[in-house]
UniProtKB/Swiss-Prot annotation:
UniProt GO MF annotations: glutaminase activity; pyridoxal 5'-phosphate synthase (glutamine hydrolysing) activity
GO BP, one annotated term: glutamine catabolic process
GO cellular component: cytosol; glutaminase complex
Protein name, UniProt field: Pyridoxal 5'-phosphate synthase subunit PdxT
Catalytic activity: aldehydo-D-ribose 5-phosphate + D-glyceraldehyde 3-phosphate + L-glutamine = pyridoxal 5'-phosphate + L-glutamate + phosphate + 3 H2O + H(+); L-glutamine + H2O = L-glutamate + NH4(+)
Subunit structure: In the presence of PdxS, forms a dodecamer of heterodimers. Only shows activity in the heterodimer.
Amino acid sequence: MAGSPRVGVLALQGDVREHLTVLWALGADAVRVRRPDELETVAGLVIPGGESSVMDKLARTVGLAGPLRNAIAGGLPVYGTCAGLIMLADTIVDGIAGQRSLGGLDVAVRRNAFGSQAESFETDLSFPTLGAEPMHAVFIRAPIVESVGPRATVLARVPDGRVVAVEQDNLLGTAFHPELSGDKRFHEYFLVKVHGRV
């Protein structure tokens, strides 16, 4: 869409293409971000699902970890799904040795909290923020938000009460993968944040 702010998808590892496809379908000027100079060109960023410890190592290796932290602290709208939620959390309860998050979201998360790949599942979630219609959510080796600090807001829980979606200012995080369900409302909600900041 002409005149749309540019939105990046962190393209170090994970389901980058799936997020780009959703963003393009919504008319966004979406691009891959692999280097600090590419990060400087975007008005919003999606951190995709994948493996959070690998993303952390790669971000440090290519010199993106510091610029990402600075951009988040500076108010850049960022949406993290699954591993992206882990990357945005202020605290990783069970990170591997040396693993660091980017921080910004006042939450503590536990990696792979729902179990292994074989225990992945799908369910419908209520999102009053996004409308009355439930959202179909895909959970793949998903994290869980174990605690939510006073600066963050819970957006959704699974039926047993565990938190799976949070928001804080320009930051969004989901333990599930809306890019795989066909429901574009979460990406639309994120784009509203991006447009509101430019």
